[in-house]
Amino acid sequence: MVSRRVQALLDQLRAQGIQDEQVLNALAAVPREKFVDEAFEQKAWDNIALPIGQGQTISQPYMVARMTELLELTPQSRVLETGTGSGYQTAILAHLVQHVCSVERIKGLQWQARRRLKNLDLHNVSTRHGDGWQGWQARAPFDAIIVTAAPPEIPTALMTQLDEGGILVLPVGEEHQYLKRVRRRGGEFIIDTVEAVRFVPLVKGELA
């Protein structure tokens, strides 16, 4: 039985077009208030992005659900997340697949996310302090890659780390950003534009 606030959010997400019940169940199972500062706990189940420090944000629940749905995950999917951030999106993925690899360039955020995931008994996640533009070549190929910050163009390294039939979902752009879905078909990459979005930039190379 979910709380009234959680149910209200799920109803809102359905009204916004989220159809995958597995994704909605994962959102209901992950306590979003555990991934925000105490000052924002009362807003944790509002359908808005919230600051998490270091110039980063925890994404709006609609966008978390939309991007996760676009990945077309199965329990066996090998998943890479670029931009661990608070660990909230990571936790959603961990409820849906057997294992998640996640890269974060800001060491402090990586440590906090690892602690939160451990406290929720989510042990099927590997995190790494690194440059998200480069993905995680040692763990490739991946069936699904999700990027939670916006590069100005699609990073080549991430496309090449997709397995055959794999899907990459990410925001792309600077002043004007669009959510893109990239599907690998043999030597080709089929790119679809989904909708206009607004994300923090994906910083290249610079670790913090």
From Swiss-Prot:
What InterPro entries does the annotation carry? Answer: PCMT, SAM-dependent_MTases_sf
Q: Which domain of life is it from?
A: Bacteria
E.C. number(s) listed in UniProt: 2.1.1.77
Binding partners and assembly: Monomer.
GO CC terms, sorted:
cytoplasm
Reaction catalysed by this enzyme? [protein]-L-isoaspartate + S-adenosyl-L-methionine = [protein]-L-isoaspartate alpha-methyl ester + S-adenosyl-L-homocysteine
Q: Where does this protein come from, organism-wise?
A: Shigella flexneri
**From the UniProt record, which GO molecular function terms apply?**
protein-L-isoaspartate (D-aspartate) O-methyltransferase activity
User: What is its subcellular localisation?
Assistant: Cytoplasm
Please list the residues that make up the active site.
S59
Q: Which UniProt keywords apply?
A: Cytoplasm, Methyltransferase, S-adenosyl-L-methionine, Transferase
Task: Identify the HAMAP family for this entry.
Answer: PIMT
What is the protein's major site of localization? cytoplasm
Function of the molecule: Catalyzes the methyl esterification of L-isoaspartyl residues in peptides and proteins that result from spontaneous decomposition of normal L-aspartyl and L-asparaginyl residues. It plays a role in the repair and/or degradation of damaged proteins.
Q: Name one GO biological process term.
A: protein repair
NCBIfam families, from UniProt?
A: pimt, PRK00312.1
As for family, the record states: Belongs to the methyltransferase superfamily. L-isoaspartyl/D-aspartyl protein methyltransferase family.
Record-linked PROSITE patterns: PCMT
What name does UniProt use for this protein?
Protein-L-isoaspartate O-methyltransferase
